[in-house]
């Protein structure tokens, strides 16, 4: 029987620090087939092109990064775009600015999934709307994955408890809120990641005065399934 500590480590894994020779620091959180990396890239630093068997998706949280996937390079500013590097497609980055860049990268290799991407590997904002009154969300969508940026209003704003068939991963990128998965509650602060498997009950509430912001990833898309189906049909 799992203890409370075991459950917390399952849903909210303790991040492990990885330090690279070029000064990049990454905090790695893993559950099953998926790794979340919170990366800090120093000014004027190169991340050399590399490739691996996992698909990798990511976006910039703070600052500006010159990101290259395959033979395509694009400047990525905070929360304005996302990238997908399919398995074995080279990808690298450079921080050309005088400021540290903070980025989120997610690596995943799960049996039965097909990892498609746009021809140029980058996703623009698909839509922004209110998911609930006062809760604005922004979406990036590909046929197998959906990224949702969400603002949870302060003073009691909440995402009511629910469950669904989608796997869901989230990272706090601003403010704070309480996140509960299957009765296990954690105070989310900047960089905290959670992992929620299909049909696991979960919800969130922001008890602070300031709004909070989070990045939420769904496998497969939850809110824009029609968009995903159109992309899938186009690929076939």
Swiss-Prot record:
Keyword Iron: yes
Gene: bacB
Cofactor(s) this protein cannot do without: Fe(2+); Co(2+)
Pathway: Antibiotic biosynthesis; bacilysin biosynthesis
Reaction catalysed by this enzyme: 3-[(4R)-4-hydroxycyclohexa-1,5-dien-1-yl]-2-oxopropanoate = 3-[(1E,4R)-4-hydroxycyclohex-2-en-1-ylidene]pyruvate
GO MF annotation, one: iron ion binding
Protein name in UniProt: H2HPP isomerase
Source organism superkingdom: Bacteria
Subcellular compartments: Cytoplasm
Keywords for the protein's UniProt record, in alphabetical order: Antibiotic biosynthesis, Cobalt, Cytoplasm, Iron, Isomerase, Metal-binding
Residues that coordinate or bind substrate: 223
Pfam families found in the cross-reference section: Cupin_2
Entry-linked InterPro entries: Bacilysin_H2HPP_isomerase (IPR052535), Cupin_2 (IPR013096), RmlC-like_jellyroll (IPR014710), RmlC_Cupin_sf (IPR011051)
Enzyme Commission (EC) number: 5.3.3.19
Cupin type-2 domain segment(s): 40-106, 151-215
UniProt-annotated binding residues for a divalent metal cation 2: 162, 164, 168, 202
First-level EC class: isomerase
Species assigned in the record: Bacillus amyloliquefaciens
Assembly mode: Monomer.
One of the record's GO cellular component terms: cytoplasm
Note on cofactor: Binds 2 Fe(2+) or Co(2+) ions per subunit.
Physiological role: Part of the bacABCDEF operon responsible for the biosynthesis of the nonribosomally synthesized dipeptide antibiotic bacilysin, composed of L-alanine and L-anticapsin. Bacilysin is an irreversible inactivator of the glutaminase domain of glucosamine synthetase. BacB catalyzes the allylic isomerization of the endocyclic-delta(4),delta(8)-7R-dihydro-hydroxyphenylpyruvate (en-H2HPP) to generate a mixture of 3E,7R- and 3Z, 7R-olefins of the exocyclic-delta(3),delta(5)-dihydro-hydroxyphenylpyruvate (ex-H2HPP).
